């Protein structure tokens, strides 16, 4: 996924 400064599921990175 993309490198964003938004927490996705808990990880503050584009790691879904």
From Swiss-Prot:
Principal EC category: oxidoreductase
Enzymatic reactions: L-glutamate + NAD(+) + H2O = 2-oxoglutarate + NH4(+) + NADH + H(+)
Active site: 12
E.C. number(s) listed in UniProt: 1.4.1.2
GO function terms (MF aspect): glutamate dehydrogenase (NAD+) activity
Keywords from the UniProt entry: NAD, Oxidoreductase
Protein family according to the UniProt entry: Belongs to the Glu/Leu/Phe/Val dehydrogenases family.
Protein name as catalogued: NAD-specific glutamate dehydrogenase
Native species: Thunnus thynnus (Atlantic bluefin tuna)
């Amino acid at each position: 996924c993309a490198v964003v400064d938004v927490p996705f599921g808990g990880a503050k990175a584009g790691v879904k």
